[in-house]
């Protein structure tokens, strides 16, 4: 690490990444995993979404939505819960492992936070 002129080291960087920012990163990456049809919001997210739609006339673009992802950032860790819908023909265990890996990597790469990612397969779409 390079020291600034004058011989003193730079102070450590202090920052906080909000829950919504992490949720959007996680949702965006989870949607790209082959076999993920959609993300599914839980009841609390559905109710908040309805309230937000009623209160805000401007809809949130699809790529910025975080439905189906719940996040709690605590210090340098993010607890991430992702709820996905898949389609028949994909192995649920393999899909969950891939989503877990991809979302964790995206959160680490983008925010610097360690992520504990839990995946729920909520439904399987039939042809």
PLM ranges: what are they?
Residues 104-108:
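Short amphipathic alpha-helical signal-transduction/dimerization elements
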Residues 1-92, 98, 109, 113-127:
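Contiguous, often N-terminal, cationic amphipathic patches that form binding interfaces
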Residues 99-103:
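A short beta-strand micro-motif common to beta-rich folds, especially ectodomain repeats
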């Amino acid at each position: 690490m390079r020291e600034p002129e004058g011989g003193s080291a730079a102070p450590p960087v202090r920052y906080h990444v909000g829950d919504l920012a992490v949720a959007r990163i996680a949702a965006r990456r989870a949607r790209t995993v082959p076999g993920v049809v959609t993300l599914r919001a839980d009841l609390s997210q559905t109710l908040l979404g309805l309230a937000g739609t009623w209160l805000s006339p401007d809809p949130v673009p699809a790529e910025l939505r975080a439905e189906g992802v719940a996040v709690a950032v605590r210090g340098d860790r993010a607890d991430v819960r992702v709820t996905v819908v898949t389609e028949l023909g994909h192995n649920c265990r393999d899909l969950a492992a891939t989503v877990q890996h991809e979302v964790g990597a995206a959160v680490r790469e983008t925010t610097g936070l360690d992520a504990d990612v839990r995946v729920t397969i909520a439904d399987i779409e039939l042809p």
